[in-house]
Amino acid sequence: MNSLTLSITTIGDLLLRKTITNCEEPIKDVELCVPLYQRPYKWTARNAIQLLDDIIDAKNSNKERYRVGTLILHKTKEKEQYDIVDGQQRIITFSLLLTALGENSIGVLKQKIYDNTYNDHNIANNYNALFRRVGLKSEDNDSAVEHQREMEHLKDYIENRCELIVVITTDVSEAFQFFDSQNARGKALYPHDLLKAYHLREMNNISEDETERIVKDWEQVSQRDLADFFGNYLYRIKEWVAGNKANILNEHNIHMFKGVTRLARTPYAQFYKSAYCYADMVNSSAMPFVSGTRNVNAFQLDTPIIAGKPFFEYTKHYYNILKDIQNNNKYEGFYINDNIIVKTLDRHFKKGIGNGITRLMFDTSVLLYVDRFCPETYPTKEDIDLFEQFVIYAFIWAYSLRAQYTNLGWLSAQNYIMGWSEKINTFNMYKLIAKQDTPTSLLSALADKLNPLSNDDIKDGWAQECYEYSGDGETLKNLKDEKDGVYENYLYFFQTNGYYKN
């Protein structure tokens, strides 16, 4: 039966005496553990010194008790240990602070915290910063004696006056509910942090070594990049395919990335789990190599995710495809290579909110096309030709929006994407892609839907500055200007592809 314990304990009892006090019956032999699903230790020296200064202020203000936060623990049945669900950053920082004050037997710092550049750097850096403030002075004078006396009083205050609220549960799901609630009231974590924790809990049938490898792979990617990837790309694609406006990914809508759990038994769930298992089985075998066939794609952007390990594979799969799409290097990647349109966009149209929105529309539509129609391996010439034609259509669709605004913001962009705008070429590209069974049917539909722009339609100030009307007012004199083979005006590609009319 699941149990829940609420208590208050001092830092000294918890970290030095391994005891949680101030509850019906003190809990002894509390072995704190930082589980694999935890984020790296990311507090910087500034955070650590700020905590120290707050404690000193509380002590100097004669506060009898100083509440320093909440610690959420999951008591595991298998190892009789207490996994830190929330509060890791403070616990490690307090451990470093007490070590700098002379304690050398703090269990949290003795356990293996998996190898990570953040852990290695921040733990060492923060300890050094704290030691410079509170460590024993080498000089033998009155000032050093006074400093030592003050630090002994500070150490006593930290151990016996600084308190934590402790929540202990034997139900890991309940622990994470408290965790979500805490972060909803305080500084929220990135949604992908919550998803990481959720899917790691679904991996109880995976070995510890494999779990550690998955976590390391995840943490190798910049957390800011992951936040951008989920919030601006995966989330928006899912909403737009469904015909919804895409606002902000947060804790209230991350359910769309939780997916089908291992315990789900409905026909709907079994269908998607079976499809994943089949793809995994084929790709893990020698069949693709021996037969020369293509790998089977285990994922689709507009279908449910399988919870657990597949979620991390899904993330890596689409993150790599997106980086490939965004990298126009001639000799790297499979999809966009040395594309003349993308060269112009990369060189001249990356700065500014409007250009950023438009490029995101271009990238996400290409990502959805690749996901639906491009083979992962062994593309044919027909595959490549169809893809390159789609890139032109995706560019015309996205940059028709940019050309029709002097200042473009998200409200106008969302209306354009939904097909609610009065601007030329407003329609939901994502729904259109998702409805097509073949790339040829998609390209035919786009050929019917896309219309050319006229001089009167073009409002983009930067684009207008790049050309001058000739004497008869019918042609653009310097639309063809280029440097090092890169055209300066994206409207040139409207003209050469028949989507600009005088």
Residue ranges and their predicted role:
Residues 1-502:
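Flexible coil/loop and intrinsically disordered segments
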